[in-house]
Amino acid sequence: MEAQNQEVAALVEKIAGLHAAISKLPSLSPSAEVDALFTDLVTACVPASPVDVAKLGPEAQAMREELIRLCSAAEGHLEAHYADMLAAFDNPLDHLARFPYYGNYVNLSKLEYDLLVRYVPGIAPTRVAFVGSGPLPFSSLVLAAHHLPDAVFDNYDRCGAANERARRLFRGADEGLGARMAFHTADVATLTGELGAYDVVFLAALVGMAAEEKAGVIAHLGAHMADGAALVVRSAHGARGFLYPIVDLEDIRRGGFDVLAVYHPDDEVINSVIVARKADPRRGGGLAGARGAVPVVSPPCKCCKMEAAAGAFQKAEEFAAKRLSV
C-alpha cells in the first residue's frame, strides 16, 4: 500500500508540474512546445495506475479540473488546425490519415460499435446523434462509412465555426455518405423533441467537463430520448482521468438508463466506453442496470489486440487512399 501511495504521489506531482508549464503557455495552438508538453502529459497518464482521481485532495482536484479544460482547448485548436489543412485538398476525405491520431478514432469507433451490437442485441440504427462532434467528426465518419451504412447521422456542436469546418471536409465526398451527415449548431440542453427520434446517441467525452455538468447532460438526454434507445458515453479510467472527465455510472442510472457494459482500454485508445439503454418499462427496464450487474469488459489478449490493430491500420490506409463510399 505504501508503494502505491508513493507511486500516486509521484504521478500527481509530475502532472501538477506539467499543468503548471501548460498554464504558462502563451497559446495552446499547435507548436513544438505545445506538442511536447501534451505528449509528456499523455505519456504520463496512459499507463495503468492505482490513482483514484475521485480521492484527490481539493487542490489536486482543482488542478485536474483545470487541466481537463486546458486539454479540451488544446484539442480544439489542434482539430481546427487540421480541419483547415484537410479542407485545402480537393477531396479532403482522401487525406484523413494526415491527422496524427486518426488511427485512434478508427479503433475507438470500432470498439464502440462492437460493444453496441454485443450488448444491445438486435439494434439496427437508422438515426444516430453524435453530441460534441467538433471540427473533425472522425467518429461519425468512421461509424457511417464502415459500421452503420444505413444510418443518418445528426452531429451537434455548440460552435458554429466547428460545424462549418466539418462541413467543408465533405466537399467532393460520395453523395451517399455526404447525404447521411448533417451538422447542427446547438447546445444539447436546448434539444428536446429531436432526441426522441434517435436509435443511438453518442456523447463525446468533453461534453460537460465538470461532474455536475456531465450529470446534467445525461439527465437531459434521459428525459427526452426514446425508451429503449441506446446511449454510448465516453469516459476515462485511472490516470486518464487527468485528460478527460470520468463519468459516474450512478449519474447514468439516475438519468433513467440501464448501464449495460463498461470498457476500459489499456492501449493508445484513451477513452473508456460506457454502453447504456434508456429504460423501457415495457421490457422491464431498470433490471440490467442494477448495482453490481454491469459487466466491466476486459481488453482482449495481446495477440488479439495486435491482430485488431493490424486490421485497423489497414482499414485506415484504405480509408485514406480512396474516397469513402457506402
Swiss-Prot record:
PROSITE patterns: NAS. It is an enzyme of class 2 (transferase). Transmembrane segments: none annotated. One of its GO terms (biological process) is nicotianamine biosynthetic process. Induction: By iron deficiency in roots and chlorotic leaves. Keywords: S-adenosyl-L-methionine, Transferase. The keyword Membrane does not apply. Expressed in roots. GO terms for molecular function: nicotianamine synthase activity. It catalyses: 3 S-adenosyl-L-methionine = nicotianamine + 3 S-methyl-5'-thioadenosine + 3 H(+). Pfam families: NAS (PF03059). Its EC number is 2.5.1.43. Belongs to the nicotianamine synthase (NAS)-like family. Synthesizes nicotianamine, a polyamine that is the first intermediate in the synthesis of the phytosiderophores of the mugineic acid type found in gramineae which serve as a sensor for the physiological iron status within the plant, and/or might be involved in the transport of iron. This is Nicotianamine synthase 2. It comes from Oryza sativa subsp. japonica (Rice). The gene is NAS2.
